[in-house]
């Protein structure tokens, strides 16, 4: 039951961060490309790599994993919004933007998970 509270708390924080980051990215870059979703996915992927590596090194409690790994990062990152925005770009005929979005999300997010893990593992 305690882990549910941590997941809920982390989720509420992650949702607020996601909203604020998305609004900020629209203000900076406009809305012609889904930079907000890309940014939250990249940040979340990096943090997931860090949390995973810390967990592997037994330096993170189950409560922190629930708070950050499931709650905060689960609410911060978004595959459904990425999918919807990519489909909208395709439906608008913006194929280059759609495939750029797919490539950036996939490549950057995988790299950021790796980078987060390596950062932690190199310090342990």
Curated annotation (Swiss-Prot):
Subcellular location: Cell inner membrane
Sequence positions that bind Na(+): 74, 77
Catalytic activity reported: fluoride(in) = fluoride(out)
Main location: membrane
Membrane-topology descriptor: Multi-pass membrane protein
Entry's transmembrane regions: 4-24, 35-55, 62-82, 102-122
Regulation of its activity: Na(+) is not transported, but it plays an essential structural role and its presence is essential for fluoride channel function.
Keyword Cell membrane attributed: yes
GO MF entries: fluoride channel activity; metal ion binding
Pfam family, one: CRCB
Key words of the record: Cell inner membrane, Cell membrane, Ion channel, Ion transport, Membrane, Metal-binding, Sodium, Transmembrane, Transmembrane helix, Transport
GO CC terms in record: plasma membrane
Physiological role: Fluoride-specific ion channel. Important for reducing fluoride concentration in the cell, thus reducing its toxicity.
Family, per entry: Belongs to the fluoride channel Fluc/FEX (TC 1.A.43) family.
Protein name listed in UniProt: Fluoride-specific ion channel FluC
Organism: Shewanella loihica (strain ATCC BAA-1088 / PV-4)
This protein's encoding gene: fluC
């Amino acid at each position: 039951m305690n882990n549910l509270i941590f997941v809920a708390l982390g989720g509420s924080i992650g949702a607020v961060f996601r909203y604020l980051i998305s609004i900020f990215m629209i203000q900076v870059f406009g809305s012609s490309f889904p930079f907000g979703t890309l940014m939250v996915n990249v940040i979340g992927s990096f943090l997931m790599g860090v949390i995973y590596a810390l967990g592997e090194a037994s330096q993170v409690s189950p409560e922190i994993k629930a708070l950050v790994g499931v709650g905060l990062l689960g609410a911060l990152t978004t595959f459904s919004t990425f999918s919807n925005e990519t489909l909208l770009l395709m439906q608008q005929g913006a194929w280059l933007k759609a495939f750029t979005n797919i490539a950036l999300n996939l490549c950057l997010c995988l790299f950021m998970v790796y980078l987060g893990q390596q950062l932690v593992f190199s310090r342990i």
